[in-house]
Amino acid sequence: MKTIIAAIFLGILMHAFAKECTLMAAASNFNSDKYFDVPHVYVTHSKNGPKEKVCREYNTTKNSDKTTSTTVVTLKTGGTQSIVLSCNNSPKSGVKGQYFMDCQVPGGTGGINIQLESSIIATDNKNYALVHFCPITGRGVTEDIVVLQTNKDNVDPGVTSAIKNYGWSLENWKSRKDAGCQ
């Protein structure tokens, strides 16, 4: 009987931890000074994100304390709904290219707070990045990998190469090409 209970308990633990997000390693060429000099990018593709057509843009500024602040603007096609998140990004200690993100809805009632970990898994530090996000808190937030690009209309060859290096196909990802980003 003890063996059966132990096996059930182990199975429950394995199932619970199987859903945890393990942050992927950051790109070896990541350079925070160059990377955060790019103030505005578009999410052009999402591996696990919603299928609906949304335009998501990131605007980032450097802070004097070596953290960065990012404003994430999400606009559904047709401009019917806009969601703005204000995030403070702090580098993970001793890990280049990985960050803790604490995001809130500015001017909100204090009810929405989302915490994430992020890892820049591929980048050229100026035109594109693949970023892996793992939720720490936040209902409805799922693990995702997104393509960030300065050019919303074309896929940078570096993106294609990085996706291929991971054994993925961009054709299987959700494109934001027809989302109507301005």
Curated annotation (Swiss-Prot):
Family in the record: Belongs to the calycin superfamily. Triabin family.
**Keywords tagged on the record:** Disulfide bond, Hemostasis impairing toxin, Platelet aggregation inhibiting toxin, Secreted, Signal, Toxin, Vasoactive, Vasoconstrictor
Miscellaneous field: Very abundant protein in the salivary gland, accounting for at least 30% of total salivary lipocalins.
User: Which species is this UniProt entry from?
Assistant: Dipetalogaster maximus (Blood-sucking bug)
Which GO MF terms are attached to this record? toxin activity
Tissue-wise, where is it found?
Expressed in salivary glands.
What GO terms describe the biological role, i.e. biological process, of this protein?
A: symbiont-mediated perturbation of host defenses; vasoconstriction
Keyword field contains Protein biosynthesis = no
The residues the entry assigns to the signal sequence are: 1-18
Q: Which InterPro entries match?
A: Calycin, Triabi/Procalin
Q: Which GO terms describe its cellular component?
A: extracellular region
**Name of the protein in its database record:** Dipetalodipin
Q: Does the keyword Disulfide bond apply?
A: yes
Cystines in this chain: C21-C134, C55-C181, C87-C103
Function recorded in the entry? Inhibits platelet aggregation, vasoconstriction, and angiogenesis through binding to distinct eicosanoids involved in inflammation (acts as a scavenger), and has a role in inhibiting host innate immunity by impairing platelet-assisted formation of neutrophil extracellular traps (NETs). Inhibits platelet aggregation by collagen (IC(50)=30 nM), thromboxane A2 mimetic (TXA2 mimetic), or arachidonic acid (AA) without affecting aggregation induced by ADP, convulxin (GP6 agonist), PMA, and ristocetin (vWF-dependent platelet agglutinator).
Could you tell me where this protein is found in the cell? Secreted
